[in-house]
Amino acid sequence: QVARADGGVTSNWIHDSLKIGESLKISGAYGTFIGDPAVDTPVLCLAAGTGLAPVLALAEAALRRGFRKPVTMLFSARTREDVYSQGMMAWWRTKHRNFDYKITLTREEAEGYLAGRIDVVLPKVFSDLSKHTIFAAGSPEFVETCVATVKKLGAKDELIHTEGFFAQQQPVVA
């Protein structure tokens, strides 16, 4: 499923032009996000929207190789309808004692979910991030907010890794 992103080149093309049954040739993602945290600190993964995909892959790689430090996932979604992969995260929580996740909703309140944007919620969940490695993925605005917030909580620049999604310049076709 592809969610329409405001101003998103690809998601809007899919919703407006692609017909059911049409074929696409796609290739892998080409981001710069690190694939497996080779760190010896607790890990905090922050994600919004489709930014959850790379941090889920990162967390899964770490857990599969036996990473022992705490891994916490904080996922921000507008509504419960926008939440995906919650079942997998719940399963990881039962299988890996060092994994935990929390979901925050920004446009509704619901039992079992935190409420509010990352910059408001994060200080309520963590008071000190000086010993954490941070991975943040999502829109550029989300990532910028995460970086500013974790720095206020003591995170060190060298332990902050980001993946901000942005519209890439389209090739000129002659």
Task: Describe each model-derived feature in a short phrase.
Residues 50-55, 142:
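Hydrophobic/small residue at the entry helix of a nucleotide-binding pocket
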Residues 36-39, 65-67, 127-128:
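Short, flexible hinge/linker loops that cap or flank conserved catalytic cores
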Residues 1-23, 77-79, 104-108:
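Ferredoxin-reductase
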Residues 9-10, 31-38:
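Short, Lys/Arg- and Gly-enriched loop/turn segments at beta-strand edges
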Residues 71-174:
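Reductase modules of NAD(P)H-dependent flavoproteins
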Residues 36-50, 153:
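Short, compositionally biased
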Residues 54-64:
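Histidine-anchored nucleotide/phosphate-binding helix
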